[in-house]
Amino acid sequence: MQNLTVALDAMGGDFGPRVTVPAAVQALSYFPELKVILIGDRNAITSQLSSLGRMPDSRLSIQHCDRVISNSEKPSLALRNSQGSSMRAAIDLVAESQADACVSGGNTGALMALSRFRLKLLPGIDRPALVSALPTASGNRTWMLDLGANVSSDADSLFQFAVMGSALAEQHLGRVPRVAILNIGAEEIKGNDLVKRCAEMLSNTQSVNFIGYIEGNQLLQDAADVVVCDGFVGNVCLKTCEGTAQLFIDKLKTRMMASTIKGWIARMLFSELFTELKTLNPDQYNGASLLGLRGIVIKSHGSADVSAVVNAIGEAVHEVKRQVPSRISDRLEAVLLERHY
């Protein structure tokens, strides 16, 4: 069994060690091969461990850091003043091969800037991209990128996102994934020059199974395995999907928990529907990968609860086992050779 180490930014996210420490302990019970380095304020981390009846051991260690990068800190400022911060220390461990992956729920812009600075980009990649899985009506998943690492992108970057997303999805699915571009229509004539140029490039690439355009109303319909868009569009779509799913879950939960006869009827009629809707809960898909780097970095939701952070750690474990950066590099090399000839 392959042993692996995850560096967890214990101070990242809205709740810090109150969530990250219990999540680390749970993750250790799920993954026997896992070691976790908790990075942050030693006293705060130790206090949470004590409340769980757990202390540092051979699989769970603490690295003290005094500083936390705030969510309001600009990436450029965070990059200059990152020394001594929990996020920087977690990324440094990956850069120095002391950890196989990093997980953080902290400032997204700072995480991207620091990761790019310390880990560097893979050959053939101009920009990293955030990718995460979305649930679909069929029970499968669709990987979408970019989710906000870049506000705007050119056609070459979108093409690179498609290659990276395809390589990642293939490691999860065990088959060649279907890749589509998010557009305002499915017809070839629809869209701006950006998506048309990217579509032309993908159509001429045998290494990617490009199936054309899909529209926003198809995102959760299992119409594609990988959906490509720029970071502005992707982030808006992701937040809209998450908000809509949470709205339905909360509304139904409120109705079912009512102590009236209506609540009893709702529980009788909608219990199965509620179970189905819970599969749309964003927490179950927490853990966005920052693709295109020479190391594995997973971004957790800032508002993530314990189970959601466990899922983010689980994504890190999966990507380490599947050697995702190497798979992406191999795919890029094949695509570059194909385009050259």
From Swiss-Prot:
Parts of the chain that traverse the membrane: none
Primary localization: cytoplasm
Keyword Chaperone: no
One Gene Ontology term from the biological process aspect of the record: fatty acid biosynthetic process
SUPFAM superfamilies: Isocitrate/Isopropylmalate dehydrogenase-like
Pfam (any one): FA_synthesis
Record's keyword terms, sorted: Cytoplasm, Lipid biosynthesis, Lipid metabolism, Phospholipid biosynthesis, Phospholipid metabolism, Transferase
GO molecular function, one term: phosphate:acyl-[acyl carrier protein] acyltransferase activity
Reaction catalysis annotation: a fatty acyl-[ACP] + phosphate = an acyl phosphate + holo-[ACP]
Any one of the GO CC terms: cytoplasm
EC assignment: 2.3.1.274
Entry-linked Gene3D superfamilies: Isopropylmalate Dehydrogenase
Pathway info: Lipid metabolism; phospholipid metabolism
Record carries keyword Repeat: no
Self-association state and partner proteins as the record states: Homodimer. Probably interacts with PlsY.
Similarity remark: Belongs to the PlsX family.
Protein name, per record: Phosphate acyltransferase
Annotated gene: plsX
